[in-house]
Amino acid sequence: MGRDTIAEIITSIRNADMDRKRVVRIASTNITENIVQILLREGFIENVRKHRENNKYFLVLTLRYRRNRKRPYRNILNLKRISRPGLRIYSNYQRIPRILGGMGIVILSTSRGIMTDREARLEGIGGEILCYIW
């Protein structure tokens, strides 16, 4: 049975966010690097570093928190894996769902790489819906 690396990074980020940890370490693959770059560009994470340990590469993510008077509160509210190895979900560009009326993002795997729902609509291409973030 193969590993679902997308589900692993979503679970790692969600668990660290719920436990209010600022740093998350995940395994580095091409897919995880592309997803992390989208999260960085959209402002859900603050910083990314590539770390090498025993000939294996890891990504070290710094989560973004907003501060108020009492304590820091979370920036990422929810992450949800949609298409999984046992049930793939595909969509054309016209039927890509809008999360919270456009406030959240959908990450898609397309023929032109991994991108957000806004980028896919602008380019007029659909693909596999990987996850929702809102």
Curated annotation (Swiss-Prot):
Keywords, ordered alphabetically: Chloroplast, Plastid, Ribonucleoprotein, Ribosomal protein, RNA-binding, rRNA-binding
Transmembrane intervals: none
InterPro entries: Ribosomal_uS8, Ribosomal_uS8_CS, Ribosomal_uS8_sf
One Gene Ontology MF term: structural constituent of ribosome
Highest taxon of source: Eukaryota
Alphabetical GO biological process terms: translation
Keyword Ribonucleoprotein: yes
Principal location class: plastid
Record bears the keyword Ribosomal protein: yes
Subunit structure, as described in the record: Part of the 30S ribosomal subunit.
PANTHER family assigned to the protein according to its UniProt record, in alphabetical order: 40S RIBOSOMAL PROTEIN S15A
Family the entry assigns: Belongs to the universal ribosomal protein uS8 family.
Annotated HAMAP family: Ribosomal_uS8_B (MF_01302_B)
Function per UniProt: One of the primary rRNA binding proteins, it binds directly to 16S rRNA central domain where it helps coordinate assembly of the platform of the 30S subunit.
Protein name according to UniProt: Small ribosomal subunit protein uS8c
The organism of origin for this protein: Nicotiana tomentosiformis
